[in-house]
Amino acid sequence: MAKQPSVAVGIDIGTRFIKVAEVRAGKPPVLTNVGIAPTPEGAVDAGGILDKNAVAAALKRLLAESGISTKQAIFSIAGQNAVVVRVLEVPRMNPSELRTHMDWEIQRNIPFADPRVQSAYEIVHRPGEDPNDPNMEVVLAVAQQDAVDGLVDIADKVGLEPYAIDVEPLALGRSLILSQPDMQQGAVAVINLGANATSIDIYDRGLLSFPRVLPTGGDMMTRAVAERLMLPEAEAEQLKVQLAEVLMDQVPLGTPFGAPGGGFYTPTLGGVPPTPPAGMPFAGSESAPMPGLDMPGGEAETPPEVPPSPFAAEPSPEPGLPAAQPAADARKVQVFQAIYPLLEELVSEIRRSVEYFRSRHTGADIGQILLCGGGAVIPNLDQFIATSIGIPTSVANPLRGVQLNVRRHGPEYVASHAHLLAVAIGMGLHPCF
């Protein structure tokens, strides 16, 4: 195993932005440099990296501009067609039996067309668990070999040494849960709102319990704005960034939790992994364990049909209010009307995941929801989710668990971009946990 570095750079290559965070190990860990730069257009999509040369050139520039000189790197591996993660309940067994189970199950259930994969698994030891329980939990990761090789190739082009290739749910667990002791007392849901995908990861007492990925993100909101307002997507994206806001006074009236009858409805769990039959062997493989591959991010789900927009026509002015609205306010209403069905769908999927977690973890309840990623800072989104789900919701702060000593950027810059840096900081924290 590679020697644990004292300083490492976490690298998060997204479809819109490349994010880097340099962390020095310590108690507490120290965040020494960060950087964010646009991903070259067309170089990365929902399935993974398409243009390694363009990504490598952009990453090399970003590291130089950010003052990051360390060579030890932890890369995030992501993409709905590149990586999956599962938390599985399997019969309790010894390591040799578990290895056989995993080898057989991974070969039977590889979710990719190309069978060449890297995989890893780890037994989950939860605080206070009953040693006589007939079952145990295992976190399983499977990554496309080509995706792993692509990251190693990029590291070589940039002159980096890949200490580890990690996955988003565990990185978010480090930056938002493990580095913040008060977050380890109960269950927390982390919603990472990206451009092409949204992840829902639930942690119980600091440990990953339920990872899920939805194939929907900010780009779908951009397309919704473009279609409703009949604009080019580039203009719609700019309008979304400038004006997207949850207008609470425009939300259709409903029950406190946005479901018939109030409270949480009983979902069909469509798109949520089913509870496996008792006694059935479950998934995985050690198949040439990959150095540093920590468990990946969930499997893309087939999204439910988006409900028709409740805004079939422009709202009539309320009595006593002027009939005409300022142009900017009217435009903001139009943008909200365009994205509302997607926000409603997001809330439905969060609720579905919460109910699934509750069904599998008797007595455990989610105390709060944390938002990160580019969509996390849509004004009032946290309030909308909290009101709809009935769980306190806020924008996550990955800076709470580290000491800030960033040399190239002021604290204001780092704080204002913290929601984008949660994965990169979690990658940089890899040697610390």
Show where each model-derived region lies:
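Non-catalytic, solvent-exposed interaction/assembly segments
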Residues: 1-105, 109, 149-151
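Small-residue (GG/TT-enriched) beta-loop-alpha framework at ligand/catalytic clefts
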Residues: 3, 12, 22-32, 69, ...
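Phosphate/pyrophosphate-binding loops at sites that engage ATP/ADP/AMP, CoA/4′-phosphopantetheine
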Residues: 59-72, 231, 353-367
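Active-site neighborhood for divalent-cation/phosphate handling
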Residues: 76-178, 368, 398-401, 423
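Phosphate/ATP-binding catalytic cores across multiple sugar-kinase/actin-like superfamilies
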Residues: 147, 151, 171, 175, ...
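Glycine-rich phosphate-binding/hydrolytic loop that grips phosphoryl groups
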Residues: 166, 171-174, 219, 226, ...
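Phosphate-binding glycine-rich/basic clefts of nucleotide- and phosphate-handling proteins
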Residues: 208-347, 373
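Glycine-rich phosphate-binding loops at beta-strand->alpha-helix junctions
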Residues: 245, 366-386
